[in-house]
Amino acid sequence: MSHSILRVARVKGSSNTNGIQRHNQRENKNYNNKDINHEETYKNYDLINAQNIKYKDKIDETIDENYSGKRKIRSDAIRHVDGLVTSDKDFFDDLSGEEIERFFKDSLEFLENEYGKENMLYATVHLDERVPHMHFGFVPLTEDGRLSAKEQLGNKKDFTQLQDRFNEYVNEKGYELERGTSKEVTEREHKAMDQYKKDTVFHKQELQEVKDELQKANKQLQSGIEHMRSTKPFDYENERTGLFSGREETGRKILTADEFERLQETISSAERIVDDYENIKSTDYYTENQELKKRRESLKEVVNTWKEGYHEKSKEVNKLKRENDSLNEQLNVSEKFQASTVTLYRAARANFPGFEKGFNRLKEKFFNDSKFERVGQFMDVVQDNVQKVDRKREKQRTDDLEM
């Protein structure tokens, strides 16, 4: 059976938003993705927008209309979340074009219920690749109008629950898709571990009882040995070997009645101790004790392996922290540079007629050349920042006039 697939991811920075826009709306002339069949691109469609849009403008419009937070939005706040809905090729091969569209419309309905219809940006269906899929995007605004990707997306557990809800929703629509086994396997592993812990506690108790019995038997054995050592020396029997010869020892010991009784008790105690020890060795507890020792050694090996893996992960985390610090430094330099370019852009636009038109032509030229595409993206970011400054100043002028 086929599986339902739902993915979401935060989009950081307007340049990444622009890249997603150009990919989704097929604005680039060259693509590294060999799965794209450009002869089929005309079949693509957007379930929200009738024509291509500028993602950044729609994000700004959505925030202007729906944001009601009291604080100013931080420059590094996540304004855009992108996602994907699909299944496998076998699932879509069994559907007609109308049924495929219905599946994606039902999926969009689910997303609108989750994130708010008013916050949805696009729902672009690609039919020009090997497996049909839908790219969707939204502004992570909460029900009370705050901008919070963290609250809207949550953690891994929340994402797992989101996938569960999505699978239930599409199945209610009659698509018969599996959610997958990762969650079930995880729960089984947790249950098995819980049971193992319970069993381990039980066997620890049983093992302690066996140890106590062994110690008791050992003490009795040592006591018997000490008692035998402390017994006073015996007299040896002697006899006359000849009619006229003296008396010689026969090698046999002479015991009094009390000494003989004490010796019998010591021998009986020793026999009981040996019997008890043999009985303990033959019990399941003794066998389980040996098995537990083997399992303990096995678990030690597993723990050591985990420790080695943890050490490697720690080194990797430290490396990533250093890279993050370096990127933050680069980001500060980049922000200062962008601020300078915005100032230069506005000055050139004010003093040189036709500057903006020439800037746009040059930007498009760079975008269509894979070698200079990043330059085009940077120019796009500069224009976006200029537009933000323009809107801010226009709003300030409007507020001043109203006062």
UniProtKB/Swiss-Prot annotation:
UniProt GO BP: DNA recombination
Pfam family, one: Mob_Pre
Residues noted as binding DNA in the record, renumbered to the chain: Y45, Y115
Task of the protein: The interaction of the RSA site and the PRE protein may not only serves a function in plasmid maintenance, but may also contributes to the distribution of small antibiotic resistance plasmids among Gram-positive bacteria.
Region (Disordered) location: 10-31
UniProt xrefs under CDD domains: MobM_relaxase
Keyword annotations: DNA-binding, Plasmid
Compositional bias annotation for Polar residues: 13-22
Gene name of this polypeptide: pre
Note: Contains conserved positively charged amino acids probably involved in the binding of the pre protein to the RSA site.
Gene3D superfamilies, sorted: 3.30.930.30
Protein name: Plasmid recombination enzyme type 1
Family (UniProt): Belongs to the plasmid mobilization pre family.
GO MF annotation: an example: DNA binding
InterPro entries hit by this protein: Mob_Pre (IPR001668)
